[in-house]
């Protein structure tokens, strides 16, 4: 048997090699293969949002003004969801609804699906960008894994939830006040604050904020190579190469405060990664459950007793009444196409009224 040692050579004009060389070249803004997905999608998502909030009305879909042109400001402008009658249509510009008419497409809510889908793929492109760069400089991919958490929340809230409901209409519109309205909707119709997945999400986000504050303060407190500056910001060089804080001192401090403390940096930083990422993933799973109309905790015995005994009321039963009020008052405002009219006598009132 003959073994030939040599180097396999490709054609010098191989298109893939030419593209790979150009895309992954060291430049001020890295492009990469992921950039082919990230940059166009981010451009179209942001461009669609700025266009919608500046010029496009929601009169035909929600009966609302939603653009700067109509008098909204940054907090009240939004790119609104399509009308409920359009269900889960992709609302393509050339589709049967708009038939290539850009003005009609905007009036029907086509910009929302445009922004939502390009936004989702743009976020995925950003995560792939982190994978690609980590691989290029031989880092672990934990940044990309961490970024999967906000992607999961975005996809579950803006895409999976409305897919489980009757249409895109019930997704959040892209605007500040619009998101607030959606939060009230989630509470009134799903009792979201009493959902265990929401509780885990809150614990993750607030816990991560606490960990971040503690960690930053501890590192600042245990610097042992300070300069002679008058304050913390002048007292050390932010570009120095070596670590100049004492893990041992930090460990002794927190051992005295709590009785326990992290003894190595890997476990400490993994915990800071784990807490927020797990919290956001749990929130995303909870929203997937809401897409299927899964219920939060129900304490029916308290509801029955409150209905029978005017003197018995808990914070839970008060919240249930508040949710009923949100549903009754909000449904007529939020779904004008249904022509819902609730007589005064069916609107909920607490035991105190």
Swiss-Prot record:
Fe cation binds at residues 215, 269. This is Photosystem II D2 protein. Chlorophyll a PD2 binds at residue 198. It catalyses: 2 a plastoquinone + 4 hnu + 2 H2O = 2 a plastoquinol + O2. 2 of the reaction center chlorophylls (ChlD1 and ChlD2) are entirely coordinated by water. One of its GO terms (biological process) is photosynthetic electron transport in photosystem II. Pheophytin a binds at residues 130, 143. GO terms for cellular component: chloroplast thylakoid membrane; photosystem II. The modification Phosphothreonine is found at residue 2.
